[in-house]
Design a protein with these regions (language model features):
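Active-site mouth loops of central-metabolism enzymes
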Residues: 10-23, 72-85, 121-127
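Conserved beta-strand positions in the central sheet of alpha/beta enzyme cores
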Residues: 40, 67-69, 104, 150, ...
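N-terminal small/glycine-rich loop or linker at the start of catalytic domains
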Residues: 1-15, 66-75, 110-118, 158
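Glycine-rich, proline-tolerant flexible connector loops at the mouths of alpha/beta enzymes
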Residues: 38-59, 110-114, 158-159
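Histidine-acidic metal/acid-base catalytic patches
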Residues: 1-35, 99-100, 115, 136, ...
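Active-site-proximal loop/turn and secondary-structure-junction residues that shape catalytic pockets
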Residues: 17-19, 43-47, 71-73, 107-111, ...
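Active-site acidic/histidine proton-transfer and metal-coordination neighborhood
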Residues: 3-4, 60, 80-187, 197, ...
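N-terminal substrate-binding region of glycoside hydrolase catalytic domains
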Residues: 28-47, 69-73
């Protein structure tokens, strides 16, 4: 396992971690000032400043990307299916413009939540099928653009509204069906917040292999958790076995950035420099 204690050269900041404290340009400037070498921006943050400005800011700051958030939200009724397809193609194009190593896919849940305005449904198996069909269609476009797709399994509490792929095993099943020969361009983004509880996690990581492990995200699970979405913990403040999981991921040969992604009303209320400084300290000591 890599030694992270000496510096934070392998730290990436998902820009949602400080989204309330400043726009993307301010976040990029702060990361460069703190010696953070990589970011993973969100599409809405890029749109707010403009894609060209975002591309230039990343380049001028000498930063790399560890991913781009996000594509997905595939389930939709017939009236919204083209919207989903076109939106995901735009996400691929944006990721390519930013030189992202992968586009992270939050696949969506039931159609009325994935694509608002879609007819209400309770048919979860149909949503699963739409997700797989949507990834299959997007994969062809993404491969032509040279942009790998990283399926991110989300915690089961998000199955209805955010992602109906809820285990690493399910994500890998999709990868194996759509890319049986492991030609590349399709894998997973593993976020410890979503998968730490899974008794099959270690087996899933081994099954993943280096070629399918496209991104690795860290934060912590607080007890109690006060909000289903906006109460992630800073690394070391919760109950996730962060070093154990990272050791298993890195045993595959994973050598890319460790990305900090924290949605937290608590941490959003603090100054950006304090949050980034804490991320750096915890990256060195507990991740």
């Amino acid at each position: 396992m890599r030694d992270l204690s000496a510096d934070h050269a392998l730290l990436s900041l998902n820009t949602a971690t400080v989204r309330k404290q400043g726009d993307l340009l301010a976040i990029i400037e702060a990361c460069a000032r703190h010696g953070v070498r990589a970011v993973s921006p969100w599409r809405d943050q890029v749109a707010a400043v403009g894609l060209e400005k975002a591309v230039r800011a990343v380049k001028d700051a000498g930063l790399k990307l560890s991913g781009y958030c996000r594509g997905g939200m595939f389930p939709a009724d017939q009236a919204h299916a083209r919207e989903a397809r076109d939106d995901n193609r735009r996400a691929v194009d944006e990721a390519a413009a930013l030189s992202a190593p992968c586009l992270v896919l939050v696949v969506g849940g039931l159609p009325q939540f994935s694509r608002p305005g879609s007819a209400p449904s309770k048919d979860l198996p149909a949503a699963h099928a739409q997700v797989e069909d949507g990834i299959a269609t997007l994969l062809e476009y993404a491969r032509a653009a040279g942009m790998p797709l990283a399926i991110e399994p989300l915690h089961p509490m998000y199955a209805a509204d955010r992602a109906c792929v809820n285990t690493l095993g399910h994500a890998l099943d999709i990868c194996d069906r759509l890319d049986p020969d492991r030609q590349g361009g399709l894998g997973v983004a593993l976020d410890v917040y979503h998968v730490w509880w899974d008794p099959e996690l270690s087996a899933g990581i081994r099954r993943c292999g280096r070629d399918r492990m496209l991104a690795y995200h860290v934060c912590d699970w607080l007890v109690p958790t006060r909000d289903l979405l906006l109460d992630r913990g800073m690394m070391g403040d919760g109950v996730i076995g962060l070093r154990r999981i990272r050791s298993e991921v890195e045993a595959l040969g994973f050598d890319s950035f460790v990305e900090v992604e924290i949605f937290s009303n608590d941490w959003w209320s603090r100054p950006m420099d304090e949050v980034i400084g804490t991320c750096i300290a915890r990256h060195r000591t507990v991740v």
